[in-house]
């Protein structure tokens, strides 16, 4: 039995604030939703279940019951999941606020116990203090939290009562314990005070549960990667040929400077929180999905589908436009891919083709060449530390000759105007040289790969990890989405 889930079910009848805060999806009707085949703790009801992705952050951290409430720990609506969320760094004041939250929402005193006795004693079998009927009173205050590590300084902690154990190797979070950052003896005293109000039959169960959960060791934090995010919220814009992501958040017009001000209103101005929850709107943000994680994933898929036979072919068109050649056709893959990746693939394959055919005697695209595996490796090594080594291996497979102690290759350029301009810009020359050394060859390859992507300025993870306040600010400034003109043609001569 999930104690936190039971506590939300019973305590929601205490106050007007509890009726809104403790209304979780796990205590309502189940709606069929696909799960992510990941077992873990649902952050909203704290029970172990099959997790599904959240519509707010695209990470699997809610169960199929709670996902219907559409709540995320990154919302700015002060629902219970948001109130249990604290951003790094953790301070003693923030931990004290979490303890005050438990005491306000889930109090244990004589008045509350008498009320639950009247509610529960409906038949003779419920007259005794059985755990089955009073499990919601066995809610100890612990400082365990599910930690999300987006970056070294971008961490979120969702506090809750995470009972039992489960292999969370595939979950995006790890359970950490902050009892040492607070005060172990002080937390014991707070729980002993709560326990003293319980009937004698329930005290041992409360104490056992508290000491088991409050002394748990912290797990090593897990770095969240792009592969942890679901593909269900990704939308491909067929007009701009760019991927985007739908982000849904609960947005309220009320603002708080930090968590401490929010918890202050929880204690002193409960009507403000009720008004914020009543006036919140479920808002959709459409954001671009241009980040380093997606770039690496797309490059890996491109290397898998790449057709290196193109470098030995006599096709006059771009590599992405070849459709009826079984050795060079890749159009099936590039039809729904970012146009920047498509342009990079065209220029890179055209450049290697011109260099290779200028130095090696080859036949046509059905030929078997030793350079083919290297071209796949070259694409896979883009934006990695192995890029220079792979470029040198590709260069050495083009039969370079030594001129005055420097290995060079010939370059007889084709009719690709985009490649012509790119080489001129990279080498900063007025006319294209017919001889290239390794440094020039490497500079051109790197320039083509980084033509549309500045890796240093790319975010590592999707926009769905941004807070709601950041998303609103970016939407108002127009930086939430990217708009590009369609690439109709590289040259007007292509249609002639």
Curated annotation (Swiss-Prot):
GO biological-process terms attached to the record: symbiont-mediated suppression of host cytoplasmic pattern recognition receptor signaling pathway via inhibition of IRF3 activity; symbiont-mediated suppression of host cytoplasmic pattern recognition receptor signaling pathway via inhibition of IRF7 activity
Chain positions covered by the region annotation Interaction with host IRF3: 321-496
Q: Where is this region: Important for cytoskeleton localization?
A: 82-177
Region annotation (RNA-binding) maps to 1-81
Q: Give the recorded effect for residue 489 to A.
A: Does not affect ability to degrade host IRF3
Bilayer-crossing residues are none
The record's section on Pfam families has: Rota_NS53 (PF00981)
Outcome of residue 479 to I?
In strain: Isolate 5S
Q: InterPro entries from the entry?
A: Rotavirus_NSP1
In which residues does the motif pLxIS motif occur? 486-489
Q: Which UniProt keywords apply?
A: Host cytoplasm, Host cytoskeleton, Host-virus interaction, Inhibition of host innate immune response by virus, Inhibition of host IRF3 by virus, Inhibition of host IRF7 by virus, Inhibition of host RLR pathway by virus, Interferon antiviral system evasion, Metal-binding, RNA-binding, Viral immunoevasion
Zinc-binding domain: region residues? 42-79
Tell me the compartments it is located in: Host cytoplasm, Host cytoskeleton
GO MF annotation list: metal ion binding; RNA binding
> Can you supply one Gene Ontology CC term for this chain's record?
host cytoskeleton
Reported effect, residue 482 to A: Reduced Interaction with host IRF3
Predominant subcellular localization, coarse grouping: host cell
SUBUNIT field: Interacts (via C-terminus pLxIS motif) with host IRF3; this interaction leads to IRF3 degradation. Interacts with host IRF7; this interaction leads to IRF7 degradation. Interacts with host CUL1 and CUL3.
Question: What family classification does the UniProt entry report for this protein?
Answer: Belongs to the rotavirus NSP1 family.
Return the domain comment text from this UniProt entry.
Answer: The pLxIS motif targets host IRF3 for degradation; however phosphorylation of NSP1 pLxIS motif is not required for its activity. The integrity of the zinc-binding domain in NSP1 is important for degradation of host IRF3.
The record describes the protein's role as: Plays a role in the inhibition of host innate immunity by inducing the degradation of key host factors required to activate interferon production such as IRF3, IRF5 or IRF7. Associates with components of cullin RING ligases (CRLs) including CUL1 or CUL3, which are essential multisubunit ubiquitination complexes, to modulate their activities.
What this protein is called in its record is Non-structural protein 1
Organism listed in the record: Rotavirus A (strain RVA/SA11-4F/G3P6[1]) (RV-A)
């Amino acid at each position: 039995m999930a104690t936190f889930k039971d506590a939300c079910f019973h305590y929601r009848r205490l106050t007007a604030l509890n009726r809104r805060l403790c209304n979780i999806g796990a205590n309502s009707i189940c709606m069929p939703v696909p799960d992510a085949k990941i077992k873990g703790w649902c952050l909203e009801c704290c029970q172990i279940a099959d997790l599904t992705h959240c519509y707010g952050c695209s990470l699997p951290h809610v169960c199929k019951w709670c996902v219907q409430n559409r709540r995320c720990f990154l919302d700015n609506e002060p629902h219970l999941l948001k109130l249990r969320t604290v951003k790094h760094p953790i301070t003693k004041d923030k931990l004290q606020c979490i303890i005050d939250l438990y005491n306000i929402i889930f109090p244990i005193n004589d008045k509350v116990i008498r009320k639950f006795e009247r509610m529960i004693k409906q038949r003779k079998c419920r007259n005794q203090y059985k755990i089955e009927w009073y499990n919601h009173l066995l809610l100890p205050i612990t400082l365990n939290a599910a930690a999300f590590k987006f970056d070294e300084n971008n961490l979120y902690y969702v506090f809750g009562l995470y009972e039992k154990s489960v292999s969370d190797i595939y979950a995006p979070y790890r359970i950490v314990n902050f009892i040492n950052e607070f005060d172990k003896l002080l937390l014991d005293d707070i729980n002993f005070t709560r326990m003293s109000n319980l009937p004698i039959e329930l005290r041992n169960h409360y104490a056992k549960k508290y000491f088991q959960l409050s002394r748990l060791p912290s797990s090593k934090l897990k770095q969240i990667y792009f592969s942890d995010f679901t593909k269900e919220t990704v939308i491909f814009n067929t007009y701009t040929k760019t991927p985007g992501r739908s982000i849904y958040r609960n947005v309220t017009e009320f603002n708080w400077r930090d968590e401490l001000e929010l918890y202050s209103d929880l204690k002193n101005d409960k009507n403000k929180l009720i008004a914020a929850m009543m006036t919140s709107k479920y808002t959709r943000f459409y954001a671009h999905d241009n980040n380093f994680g997606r770039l690496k994933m797309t490059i890996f898929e491109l290397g898998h589908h790449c057709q290196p036979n193109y470098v030995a072919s006599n096709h006059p068109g771009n590599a992405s436009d070849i459709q009826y050649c079984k050795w060079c056709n890749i159009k099936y893959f590039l039809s729904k891919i970012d146009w920047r990746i498509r342009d990079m693939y065209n220029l890179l394959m055209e450049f290697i083709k011109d260099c290779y055919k200028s130095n090696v005697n080859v036949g046509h695209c059905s030929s078997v060449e030793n350079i083919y595996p290297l071209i796949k490796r070259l694409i896979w090594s883009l934006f990695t530390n192995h890029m220079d080594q792979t470029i040198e291996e590709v260069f050495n497979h083009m039969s370079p000759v030594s001129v005055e102690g420097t290995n060079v290759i010939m370059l007889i350029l084709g009719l690709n105007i985009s490649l012509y301009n790119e080489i001129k810009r990279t080498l900063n020359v007025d006319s294209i040289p017919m001889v290239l050394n390794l440094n020039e060859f490497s500079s051109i390859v790197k320039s083509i790969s980084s033509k549309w992507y500045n890796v240093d300025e790319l975010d590592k993870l999707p926009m769905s990890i941004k807070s709601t306040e950041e998303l609103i600010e970016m939407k108002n400034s127009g930086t939430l989405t990217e708009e590009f003109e369609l690439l109709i043609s590289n040259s007007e001569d292509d249609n002639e």
